[in-house]
UniProtKB/Swiss-Prot annotation:
Native species: Cupriavidus metallidurans (strain ATCC 43123 / DSM 2839 / NBRC 102507 / CH34)
Record-listed E.C. numbers: 5.4.99.13, 3.6.5.-
Further details from the record: In many AdoCbl-dependent isomerases, e.g. methylmalonyl-CoA mutase (MCM), its G-protein chaperone is a separate protein.
Entry comment, domain topic: Is composed of four functional domains: the N-terminal 5'-deoxyadenosylcobalamin binding region that is homologous to the small subunit of ICM (IcmB), a middle P-loop GTPase domain (MeaI) that acts as a chaperone for ICM, a structured linker region involved in dimer formation, and a C-terminal part that is homologous to the large substrate-binding subunit of ICM (IcmA).
Taxon lineage: Bacteria, Pseudomonadati, Pseudomonadota, Betaproteobacteria, Burkholderiales
Binding site for Mg(2+) 1: 223, 262, 310
Keyword Ribosomal protein: no
Name assigned to this protein: Fused isobutyryl-CoA mutase
Length: 1093
């Protein structure tokens, strides 16, 4: 446990502040998750608490390199850096950060970190000895609480940075950006020498540097647009310009804290020529900081070629930026209400340029026309056409948007007229004012698809109620008729009433009731017999206990009321029958447990050995592959410390096709009993192409071995086709979930969704029927903090979004729906007991009744992984108990495959011993646990049935909330899903911390002797030899294919530009290009992911 008496290591630290009082100085923090780490839920909570305690926070989000964090910290001149690191490589990461800070004049900046149980006590001591101010452990969290840890950080950083500011302008004028940052701090704090400020303005006046002001309403996309303009300045001028960006965000009146959130959106500023500084408005009561004139002067004195000022969001009557800039750009969206509202917008009087951003929204064309006419009226330029006004329609979220380029070229002309030195640009000149691109992932006419699906499910249940009532009444009337007739009384009227109900019963419902006696007979014997053509397939239905009791594989209800029978058949039914509530297959596959054999550590050789170990003795090889974080983010291994430390940690390092061949060596990837699951998303298309080529090359090698020669071109084509039709497995590749919760997006969302569609089209064209093109995942949404209902609702909503997107591309529902699979988390909450039941029923009903899909498409197949969030670093031996309970409910709910987490995953990559224990949990349930011999044990439980209905209705209501926001993509744009996940995560953490939610061994039933386990655990880390081997193999691969790689990358880029099938080209590209080479080539034409707050 960390020693709390270990106070700040810097001489500048102040005595602890009075508890409950904000910092005496303006404390600024940079917060981020470490490189190749998408776990940003905790750091988001931390930065919110920092803000509430009066700190100004520059939040960088997930996946940030040491260089990015240090550059931000130096330019923003902060007192502290807070980093969460859950993905391994933390020792190298934090040490590299301390080294860079010391090298670049930031030695007084204090570094704080945390990573749950991933950073073990010995490593905490090592890092703190090296210079990290504090690494917070899980024990610290329990003892201090979230707010206590943040207070500790703020107190340690409560120092006045003015002491470090330059006393002359010499270093600033000479181009020292660190000195500029420190001068800005003094100016912002109002503590700069007045004579120095006067000299500063004199220097600025002589510099004649143009200033571009960008302002607009909150949420208009100013930061994204600013970043896209900077990207075009860099491209067009070949990085010859030096640009300063001053970004202003509002301070919170109550706490004085501020979220300085523009930097997180910037992808184009990572260059030595770009300087960015975030300012809080503080006490200004305006959209600009009181220090802005001085800060602009400082940037001019520093001899930048251009200064860009971006203000915080403004109202209709605000135009405070205008006096401070030479050129102003007003950014708005099409949703401004009636055209008369435009007359109230002050900036339309003053702005030199207007951008209507988010131009893909409904009514954008009309908005552009109305704004252009208003600008024309304001300027009284009746001699010009309204469409010639400097009003542009832009889509900053769309990579390489031509509307943004048109705006950029208009700005360049105006800046040149104001004296800015520019060379002829390299970007082609574009004519026009508005973006011609339209994002049609889901057509606008289908934006309410989720609400329609909710209506479909509810309509189905209304029909169930009505039809079961008719069936009950028909049976009752017939019985009454028979009794009256038997007693010699008149019964014709009853016969008429019964006939009316018979006619009102639907054909499907009559068929279900007619087949009920046959179903009872089929399941009543010792075997279930199905005839397919002339062949009988027999399945044993009886297991006999040691006591001689016969346990049936499927147990039917004993209802005699036809209304209840029909209701059960329509809402439940036996496994394998619509609506598949109890399962999509009639029986589990004999001899194949749903066990996934999980591995991923070190290099491909070590993980291959682990696969062979965990699958030993198993007839079915169900290999589940975890990749290291370098691979997850599409990069190659590298010796740079923040990359090097993560190579082969928390997963296997795969950079080339040769690595992939080693990984699955010895496993026949086309064998029906072999399937491979690959947990990867951002670079999934490239990894999938490597896997498919590995499977193909296995069979070509087999042909050579069997025939003693190479196959002919025709034979090779047949082998390729056969392999694609027979290979079994799953790739996760779920980009929507990544954007909402997991954060391994690397490309722009639009481009990633386009390539997902390319993969599915390729699968359809090549008849890839046994491999899932996507695993639509709720697991990582749950791991990010979502409760079970949100997990299920968001996951199903994402699945239906893919359905709508693929239908919009012209694919038929039955050609692609069978390639979709799902992946859920289990946990300790009661709702987890029915996740599969609810998911299967909603999917089946909507697929049949809304989309007209066939039986195969109606079957939702899903994988379950026990909850990683429920694994705790304290009393880790208790984790297996939680995992066992979660595995039990997954098996009871008929999941199609199951992965049980190892008990030590809260701290390290699973060891051989812990993986064996995790596998044993499943084996014991499947082979020893008596009730598991029955394959529908949940059916008939009053609690399970009620939970199913409650959870289903909660999911449908969430569908409607998402539909109100324009569907999944519209909700993502406003951060709806991410915000809800974070709220639910914080709620869980609060209940865990205050003990309201009891967690055994964590906040109650604590070991009185402490918890020594983390000290003695074997930590799974990649070895130095494995890392060096990966670097060496990568160098060899690059050398062997040097002659072909660049031409192939050019072909790949051109495929994107021409809007051709990218995956088809990737199938060739992976043979000569590494993962990192492909990723960076696609960045150039597909765009990088833009992080959200």
């Amino acid at each position: 446990m960390t020693d709390l008496s270990d106070v700040s290591r810097t001489a500048a630290a102040k005595p602890p502040a009075v508890p409950g009082r904000g910092p005496a100085n303006k404390v600024r923090f940079v917060t981020a998750a470490s490189l190749f780490d998408g776990h940003d839920a905790s750091i988001n909570i931390m930065r919110r608490i920092l803000q509430s305690q009066g700190c100004e926070v520059i939040h960088l989000g997930h996946n940030r390199s040491v260089q990015e964090v240090v550059t931000a910290a130096l330019q923003e001149d902060v007192q502290g850096i807070a980093i969460s690191s859950y993905q391994g490589g933390h020792v190298e990461y934090f040490k590299y950060m301390i080294d860079l800070l010391r090298e670049h004049g930031g030695e007084h900046i204090q570094v704080f970190g945390g990573g749950g149980g991933v950073i073990v006590p010995d490593e905490i001591r090592e890092l703190q000895a090296y210079g990290v101010a504090r690494i917070y452990s899980p024990e610290d969290g329990q003892r201090m609480g979230l707010a206590g840890m943040i207070t500790d950080m703020a107190q340690r950083c409560d120092i006045d940075l003015t002491r470090y500011a330059p006393t002359t302008l010499d270093t600033v004028v000479a181009g020292d950006r660190r000195a500029l940052a420190q001068l800005i701090t003094a100016l912002e704090n109002g503590k700069a020498d007045p004579e120095l400020v006067s000299a500063l303005h004199a220097q600025a006046k002589a510099a004649a540097v143009p200033v571009l002001g960008i302002t607009g309403t909150g949420g208009a996309g100013k930061s994204s647009l600013t970043d896209e303009l900077i990207r075009r300045f860099r491209l067009d001028q070949d990085d010859a310009l030096s640009i300063a960006v001053i970004s202003i965000d509002p301070s919170r009146r109550k706490s004085g804290g501020a979220l300085l959130g523009d930097r997180i959106r910037m992808n184009a500023i990572n260059h030595p020529n770009i300087f960015m500084r975030s300012l809080a408005t503080r006490e200004a009561g305006s959209e600009i900081s009181q220090a802005l004139p001085d800060v602009i002067a400082a940037c001019k004195a520093a001899r930048f070629d251009l200064v860009i000022v971006e203000t915080s969001g403004i109202g209709q009557g605000d135009a405070a930026i205008v006096p401070h800039v030479d050129l102003s750009l007003y950014v708005m969206t099409p949703e401004f209400g009636a055209a008369s509202q435009l007359e109230k917008i002050d900036m339309l009087d003053f702005a030199d340029f207007v951008a209507i951003n988010k131009f893909d929204r409904k009514g954008a064309q009309d908005a552009w026309r109305d704004v252009a006419k208003q600008v024309q009226r304001n300027r009284e330029q009746w001699h010009s056409r309204a469409e010639d006004m400097p009003v542009y329609g832009t889509q900053a979220s769309r990579f390489n948007d031509d509307g943004v380029t048109m705006l950029y070229q208009g700005l360049v002309g105006a800046l040149g007229a104001r004296g800015m030195s520019l060379k002829p640009g390299t970007l082609p000149n574009l004519e026009g004012r508005i973006s011609t691109g339209q994002n049609v992932i889901v057509p606008p006419a289908r934006s309410r698809y989720l609400a329609e699906l909710a209506d479909t499910v509810r309509a189905y249940h209304r029909r169930v109620v009505a039809q079961s009532k008719l069936a009950r009444e028909r049976q009752q009337l017939r019985a009454a008729h028979d009794m009256l007739q038997g007693a010699g009384h008149e019964s014709a009227a009853l016969e008429t009433l019964a006939s009316e109900r018979d006619v009102s019963l639907g054909a499907v419902e009559r068929k279900l009731l007619a087949m009920w006696p046959q179903m009872q007979q089929a399941y009543s014997g010792d075997e279930y017999v199905v005839k397919i053509r002339d062949k009988e397939i027999r399945t044993g239905l009886i297991s006999t206990t040691l006591s001689g009791t016969k346990i049936r594989k499927v147990v039917l209800p004993r209802f005699e009321d036809e209304g209840e029978i029909l209701k059960w058949l329509m809402r439940e039914n036996v496994p394998g029958s619509f609506p598949y509530t109890a399962g999509v297959f009639a029986f589990k596959r004999e001899g194949e447990d749903p066990t996934r054999m999980f591995a991923g550590e070190g290099d491909a050789f070590r993980t291959n050995r682990r696969f062979k170990l965990v699958s030993e003795g198993m007839e079915a090889k169900r290999l589940s592959t975890a990749f290291d974080s370098v691979t997850l983010y599409g990069e190659d291994p590298h010796e740079r410390p923040d990359i090097y430390g993560k190579v082969g940690n928390s997963g296997v390092s795969i950079a080339t096709l040769e690595d992939m061949k080693v990984l699955y060596d010895g496993f026949d990837l086309t064998n029906p009993s072999t399937s491979v699951s690959m947990t990867i998303n951002g670079p999934a298309p490239t990894i999938l192409a490597m896997f498919m080529n590995t499977a193909i090359d296995q069979q070509i090698d087999r042909f050579r071995a069997d025939n003693g020669r190479d196959p002919t071109a025709d034979e090779e084509a047949k082998i390729r086709a056969w392999v694609l039709q027979n290979v079994r497995g799953t790739v996760q590749a779920d980009i929507l979930k990544e954007d909402q919760g997991q954060n391994t997006c690397i490309f722009s969302t639009e481009f990633s969704l386009k390539v997902m569609g390319d993969i599915q089209e390729y699968f359809v064209h090549h008849q890839v029927r046994n491999f899932y093109s996507v695993s639509i995942s709720g697991y990582h949404i749950a791991e990010a903090g979502a409760n079970p209902i949100s997990q299920l609702a968001f996951t199903l909503a994402n699945g239906f979004t893919y359905v709508e997107a693929y239908l919009a591309r012209g694919m038929h529902i039955d050609d692609f729906a069978p390639n979709l699979s799902f992946f859920f988390s289990n946990g300790m909450d009661p709702e987890y007991s029915v996740l599969g039941r609810v998911a299967r029923r909603i999917w089946a009903v909507t697929m049949r009744d809304k989309y007209g899909a066939n039986d195969r498409s109606q079957k939702l197949k899903y994988h379950i992984q026990t909850s990683g969030r429920s694994l705790h670093a304290q009393e880790i031996d208790f984790n297996d108990i939680r995992t066992t309970l979660q595995a039990l409910i997954a098996i009871y709910d008929n999941c199609n495959s199951l992965h049980t987490n190892a008990y030590d995953e809260a701290i390290t990559t699973p060891t051989a011993e812990s993986v064996r224990r995790a596998l044993a949990i499943q084996l014991i349930i499947n082979r020893e646990w008596g009730v598991a011999k029955c394959e529908n044990p949940n059916q008939g439980s009053f609690l399970i049935e009620e939970l199913t209905d409650l959870v289903e209705e909660a999911v449908l209501q969430e569908f409607e909330r998402i539909a109100e926001r324009g569907g999944v993509l519209g909700a993502m744009e406003t951060g709806y899903q991410r915000g809800k996940i974070q709220e639910e995560s914080l709620y869980y953490e609060q209940l865990k911390h205050d003990g309201t939610l009891p967690i055994i061994g964590v906040n109650t039933f604590r070991n009185p002797n402490g918890d020594p386990t983390p000290q003695t655990l074997e930590l799974a880390r990649s070895s130095e030899d494995e890392k060096q081997s990966q670097l060496h193999r990568l160098t060899e691969f690059h050398g062997a294919h040097q002659a072909d790689a660049e031409a192939m990358l050019a072909r790949l880029r051109q495929a994107v530009i021409d809007n051709r099938n990218v995956f088809a080209v990737l199938m060739d590209a992976v043979r000569v290009c590494s993962l990192g080479q492909i990723t960076h080539a696609l960045f150039e034409v597909g765009g990088q992911y833009r992080r959200n707050m």
